[in-house]
């Protein structure tokens, strides 16, 4: 067995990270090579996210869309799995997405704002500016993610 702490208010406060979670979600991806994202919400529904893979494995992507940021339009990727127990914090103003590396992958994520369909946006993973090389070929992509609402 094992024990792992998934959240510690004291640690978040030490790094100045928002910890005002309003909702926690579980997402099941049945098939390997499922691509989701890059999702974000516009004001006043911007949100911070805390993402963890509790079963399976993903390559997680965060795209900084904050025009004032030194890392504007920079993309980072982190492998999350049920083996490494890592979590990733996605600040408001950043888009988030992932590709599954195993079937039956389950994610747990908490958010600091409520979902708003009107403020939901998707930035295309396939934007040439991002120059993404996926570790596996994306096979399963939702209509929403194939036809994103925004390309900068």
Regions found by a protein language model. Give the residues of each.
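Basic phosphate/pyrophosphate-binding loop/patch that engages nucleotide-derived ligands
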Residues: 101
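Non-catalytic, conserved peripheral segments adjacent to functional cores
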Residues: 1-86, 104-152
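Conserved SET/PR-domain catalytic core that frames the SAM/AdoMet-binding pocket
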Residues: 81-98
């Amino acid at each position: 067995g094992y024990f792992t702490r998934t959240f510690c208010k004291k640690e978040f406060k030490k790094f100045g990270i928002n910890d005002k979670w309003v909702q926690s979600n579980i997402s099941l991806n049945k098939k390997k090579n499922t691509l989701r994202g890059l999702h974000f919400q516009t004001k006043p529904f911007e949100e911070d996210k805390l993402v963890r893979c509790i079963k399976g494995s993903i390559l997680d992507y965060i795209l900084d869309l904050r025009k004032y940021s030194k890392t504007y339009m920079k993309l980072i990727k982190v492998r999350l799995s049920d083996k490494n127990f890592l979590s990733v914090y996605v600040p408001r103003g950043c888009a988030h997405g992932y590709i599954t590396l195993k079937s039956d992958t389950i994610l747990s994520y908490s958010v600091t704002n409520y979902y708003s369909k009107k403020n939901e946006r998707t930035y295309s993973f396939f934007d040439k500016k991002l120059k993404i090389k996926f570790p596996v070929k994306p096979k399963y992509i939702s209509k929403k993610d194939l036809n994103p609402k925004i390309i900068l």
